[in-house]
Amino acid sequence: MKSINDLIKENKFVSLPLGKKFSCAFKDWKPTKSGNGVLMQFNATEITTAKTYSGIMWLANNSVQNEEFDKTEKFIIETESELNADGYVVINMVD
């Protein structure tokens, strides 16, 4: 399996579709050089269609708050239906 550093070098950034819910596992993460967030290595499965996505995504600092993610835990996340003012997909953790 490729490391997060390999994926970054290969530019394997993935943008999840808007307005969808996913079962997601975060495999690894590292802070960005600029300190404005983290790069997350992930696998996600869209709940309604079972379509899978994998690669890396950038999460803003306010999305993560330096949380330690349990790499064995699955999370349910959802994307908002519109891009934010900066043109990024906003991802929310679902309780």
Show which residues each predicted segment covers.
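OB-fold ssDNA-binding interfaces and closely related basic DNA-contact patches used
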Residues: 1-50
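Low-complexity, intrinsically disordered/propeptide-like segments
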Residues: 10, 42-45, 62, 72, ...
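Short nucleic-acid-contacting surface segments enriched for D/E, G, S/T with interspersed K/R
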Residues: 17, 22, 61-78
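N-terminal compositionally biased, intrinsically disordered segments and leader/signal-like regions
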Residues: 46-53, 73, 80
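A generic signature of intrinsically disordered, low-complexity regions enriched in glycine/proline
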Residues: 50, 70, 74, 88-91
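A beta-strand/beta-hairpin structural motif
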Residues: 56-59
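OB-fold/S1-family single-stranded nucleic acid-binding modules
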Residues: 80-95
